[in-house]
Design a protein with these regions (language model features):
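Short, intrinsically disordered, low-complexity terminal/loop segments
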Residues: 1-3, 63-66, 749-750
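Gram-negative bacterial Sec-dependent N-terminal signal peptides
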Residues: 2-22
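Short, Lys/Arg-rich amphipathic segments at extreme N-termini
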Residues: 11, 15, 57-61, 486
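N-terminal amphipathic/hydrophobic interface segments
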Residues: 24-161, 182-190, 195-197, 260
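Outer-membrane beta-barrel proteins and related beta-barrel translocases across Gram-negative bacteria
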Residues: 116-121, 126-130, 136-183, 191-750
Length: 750
């Protein structure tokens, strides 16, 4: 409907646009489109043999019997097989079948697209016709305008001297504005059956800049995947030079697609990237491959890299999952690189390990079975690939059942680890854990636990493992494990500052006999560290190869506060070993003495604006901070800051490489300084010095990398510029600056 309450600014803007948009007026017209509730639709339905009959209504109707011309005046509505027309005046020549409509015209097709015009000439089928000063608003988004448009019986629209945009043409106040981008063309053809728009003699307009000529092309509407060129990227860095990325997507089927992406560099040979993905009724998979030829450095340690001859280099990344039945599924992933620096040199990934897995699983309410295989490729400097284990196979079976008022879980597990240049291990065990949970009349939650396990190991080449405590004994070994525990929680609830608080003291007693831990190898329980998440665990080692065999008492408390718009959760605790026998836990883990270190966690959340988590570990003797970890997020979706700080000061022996101390700072943030503009940045800084790592050569402030950028994003375009700097050399992945430009347009590669 026509609005009479427009602001003066809107009126001025409309006047300004009127002068420049006389040929292709993309602004909305002051007329409501006909709807399915129009009066014409409430007329008596046509008889089955009159399916082609036109229904209409009007304020007045004139009929000239001599010329057989019908003239409908005042808010005319016509309907025929899903096509609806609204106009001020309609003249219908029944002899020739010619229909001419004028004044506030709006035509809606069965797909929901609405066409506006000054005048329209139709056949009496309402299927084809010619429109002057045409505007088409597509149901699936976007609009087209033309000096003249023609519609054919199959629904195809042909527009001459036309323009197209998927962008909004009004600001939040309803005032008209130029779209962020549009395409003008000598001819635009819209095929509703294909959901595509075809352009001939086109020009690309962006933010009012001089237009760029375009070749003949087409693009999809409605957000469906269609073949075509995707959004390009531009990047400049020290090693590869200027990079142009121009992906092209091939829609092979409704559920299959292939994307070919050439990466063209100014300083090195091009690289090709291909990604194939398919979705089926039972699952999906995706595989990506990169390939090029370039020089690489096999020496990752020296300051001055040494180059080899040119070599084929590449990377494969794939993932798949299929649900074979309601209970059975198969999944897998593959990540393999030709060498250790390829991913970093071409800015693909900075992961230091690549995992390849395959798994067959069965899951039902009380049973779990998995057959899994693992392969790990190391990307780390001075980490021989031959020492990386190949886990094939790993079988894990678990069964839950009710027993004696409690819950019994049975488990059987086997694992074979093979190394090409290291220790080989085969392991099998069967275990059972029974838990009985009860609530007392005073509100205490009491849990009784019994655990038993029988292990069998077979180990070869133990002397190839450098850390003696990880080796175990050569050959076949067996081990029996048993433990019992009682865990008591006593929650107290009350009011606090207009909200509620809950204080829960907790005490746990665990008893376990001496276990032959060092007789078997340690493959999966090396990175042991006391923290709040494992304080009350039955076994505070991470894996199965080591089990904490001392009897101990663990005590602590949880405190939570819930206020309007805010929550606070805190936990703190410590353990005391009841037996005096020596422990296998390394010094520095917080568990090596009879009294453990004190660990805790505090989490503060204020609505969706503030989230702060602090984890800590305090030395039991002088309360020195052995672990200090803070993760904070403050802000909204558009403007926020994220900070992470970690300092591990545990004084662990240097030969235990899985538990090295370090200190680092991570910062990231985004600031929206205008409606569509934002600036962002992130950095990682290594703060490690000899206080944390005696072997460190760092001065305590070594930036690893940083990233700073600016981005514009509205409803139909995303444009960004990013500067990234890497500070560390690794072979041919050199330090230096890189610059990235990104451009993504709605319906054009986005």
């Amino acid at each position: 409907m026509l609005r009479f309450d427009l602001l003066a600014g809107c009126a001025l803007a409309a006047t300004l646009f009127a002068g420049s948009a006389h040929a292709q007026d993309l602004q909305s017209r002051p007329v409501a489109p006909p709807s399915s509730s129009d009066p014409a639709l409430s007329a008596p339905a046509a008889k089955p043999n009159d399916a082609e009959q036109v229904q209409f209504s009007a304020g007045s109707l004139e009929y000239d019997t001599n010329t057989d011309i019908v003239t409908a005046l005042t808010d005319v509505r016509m309907f025929r097989q899903g096509d609806r027309l609204r106009a001020d005046k309609v003249v219908w020549n029944r002899k020739t079948g010619r229909v001419v409509a004028t004044g506030n015209i709006a035509v809606t097709n069965p797909e929901g697209d609405v066409a506006y015009g000054d005048s329209i000439e139709l056949t009496d089928s309402m299927k084809d016709g010619v429109v002057e000063n045409m505007l088409v608003v597509l149901e699936q988004g976007g609009r087209m305008a033309a000096e003249r448009g023609q519609r054919y019986a199959d629904g195809t629209l042909q527009l001459d001297k036309a323009a197209y945009t998927p962008c909004t043409v009004t600001n939040p106040q309803g005032c008209p504005k130029e779209p962020s981008w549009k395409i003008t063309a000598i001819r635009i053809t819209y095929r509703p059956d294909r959901e595509r728009v075809y352009f001939g003699g086109g020009q690309f307009h962006l933010f009012g800049l001089p237009p760029l000529p375009l070749p003949a092309f087409s693009l999809p509407i409605g957000g469906k995947a269609e073949s075509g060129l995707l959004a390009p990227d531009f990047q400049l860095d020290r090693v590869n030079g200027l990079e142009l990325v121009a992906p092209y997507y091939f829609r092979l089927a409704p559920n299959k697609g292939l994307t070919l992406t050439p990466h063209v560099f100014s300083a090195v040979l091009p690289m090709m990237e291909a990604q194939y993905e398919a979705l089926g009724t039972n699952g999906a998979f995706r595989i990506t491959a990169y390939g090029t030829e370039s020089r690489r450095s096999d020496d990752l340690v020296t300051i001055t890299p040494t180059d080899t001859e040119r070599a084929l280099r590449g990377y494969i990344d794939g993932v798949a999952r299929y649900q074979l039945s309601p209970y059975w599924s198969v999944s897998g992933s593959v990540r393999l690189a030709s060498d250790r620096t390829f991913l970093r040199r071409y800015n693909i990934s900075r992961d230091d390990r690549l995992r390849t897995t395959a798994s067959l699983e069965r899951i039902d309410p009380n049973t779990y079975f998995a057959l899994t295989g693992w392969y790990v490729q190391s990307m780390r400097v001075n980490d021989p690939q031959g020492t990386q284990p190949i886990a094939l196979p790993e079988l894990d079976f678990r069964k839950r059942m009710d027993l004696a008022g409690g819950r019994l879980q049975l488990q059987a597990n086997t694992l074979a680890l093979t190394r090409t240049a290291g220790q080989d291990t085969q392991r099998a065990f069967v275990a059972g854990q029974w838990d009985l949970r009860r609530l007392t009349n005073w509100g205490q939650e009491v849990t009784l636990t019994g655990y038993a396990r029988l292990d069998a190991y077979n180990t070869q080449d133990t002397q190839l493992t450098s850390v003696a405590s990880y080796r175990g004994l050569e050959g076949f070994q067996t081990r029996a494990i048993g433990a019992v525990a009682v865990d008591v929680k006593w929650p107290f609830v009350g009011s606090f500052l207009g909200g509620t608080q809950r204080l829960t003291p907790r005490v746990q007693i665990v008893g376990a006999p001496r276990i032959a831990n060092l007789a078997v190898p340690n493959e999966d329980a090396r990175a042991v560290d006391l923290e709040d998440s494992n304080l009350f665990a039955l076994n505070r080692f991470a894996g199965y190869d080591r089990f904490e065999d001392s009897s101990r008492a663990t005590y602590g408390a949880e405190w939570s506060v819930a206020l309007p718009g805010a929550t606070l959760d805190a936990v703190i605790g410590q353990s005391y070993r009841l037996s005096e026998r020596p422990t296998i836990l390394p010094s520095g883990t917080g568990l090596s003495d009879r009294f453990s270190d004190i660990v805790g966690r505090t989490t503060l959340r204020i609505r969706d604006f503030v989230s702060i988590t602090h984890r800590y570990r305090l030395d039991k003797d002088g309360l020195a901070v052995r672990r200090n970890e803070v993760d904070a997020t403050i802000g909204s979706r558009s403007t926020y800051v994220m900070a992470g700080y970690l300092r591990l000061n545990r004084n662990i022996f240097p030969e235990i490489e899985d538990l090295q101390d370090r200190e680092e700072l991570r910062l990231a943030g985004r600031v929206q300084f205008a409606r569509f503009w934002s600036a962002f940045g992130s950095t990682v800084i290594d703060l490690t010095d000899r206080n944390e790592d005696p072997l460190s050569l760092s001065d305590g402030f070594d930036p690893i990398r940083h990233r700073i950028g600016v981005q514009y994003e509205d409803d139909c375009i995303r444009l960004g510029a990013t500067w990234r700097r890497d500070y560390q050399d690794t072979g041919d992945a050199r330090s230096g600056n890189s610059f990235l430009l990104t451009l993504a347009l709605t319906n054009l590669g986005r």
